[in-house]
Amino acid sequence: MTQIKAIIPAGRHALYEKHGYSAAIQSKDLLFVSGQVGSLQNGSPEIDYEKQVELAFENLGNTLEAAGCTFEDIIDVTTFHTDPENQLDLMMKVKNTIFKEPPYSAWTAVGVNWLAGFDFEIKVIARLPSDSN
């Protein structure tokens, strides 16, 4: 059986226990991060879209950090958008403050009808640095 390790950032255990999943799973040198949203500490969505995207990236950063990774270790990104035509420019503005220069990861953006009250979600796959394994 493949050895896996659950990664849950500090202060977020109740959220993941309530819904029965892990923030991320480490399998060998890969980290599979569950969809991160712009949730406030109480789990509710940030109302302002740009702030929601910023908070989703912050939550993603906390999950990566808990596993010993950074944004530079990300190799694949999937983002979900409830209104991509009107949201993509703001999302790209935030994204470009985090992913500033090549090489950029692979990226797929998907338009969806529903995200449980959220308007943006991001999931990634990262390769753990060799000193984190």
Language-model regions, residue ranges each:
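N-terminal presequence-like segments and the immediate start of the first folded domain
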Residues: 1-58, 62-75, 81-133
